Amino acid sequence: IYSQISAFNESIILVDTLLGISLDKYMGEDYPLYKRFYYDYQCASMRPERIVPDCFSFYLLSRYGLNYHEGTCLVDLMMHSGKINYVVQHLLGYEDIGQVMGCKKNEKDIWEYICANDHLHARDPMVIRYYMKPAPTVDMLGGQAPALIGSWVGARIIASYMKKHKDLKIKDLLELTDYQNMFEESGYLKL
């Protein structure tokens, strides 16, 4: 494990057996220099307490990447990202409160929005970006939904799946990639 200064480029770098943590990306969201280069919503994740979850997430993504192809749709991406988040939360025993605030109480509305707009199986990059890329907020729930809401919904679907597959080990979960089947087995539609 190495610490490094990356000139604000990469947060975590993984190469073979080396892990590099760019300390300059975790100086706290109020770090004055960040204001010159980043938007407030980007600075929110640049806190020291994000180092360990980010290390786990980057490691898992490097080991269990998504085989992205032309047929990959929003639910596949949500569940893949959600699976990584679910595992990290499970291993570290935490929940990102900032991400969850408002989501749990509005979960049904969020799901209805996705379904009503026929986005679940969307392959359009703009639709996918809406749910999966960092932004100040998502224009849903009166603009109060956090960015990356697709990842949060994906983690909720994975949690539903795991409730029905209590004997499934984390390693086995990470190796699963048939997201359409997992989605159907999750029972998540039955909020």
State the predicted function of each range:
Residues 1-101, 171, 175-176:
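Acidic/His-rich structured neighborhood in mature extracellular/periplasmic domains
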Residues 75, 79-191:
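A cross-kingdom marker for long, charged
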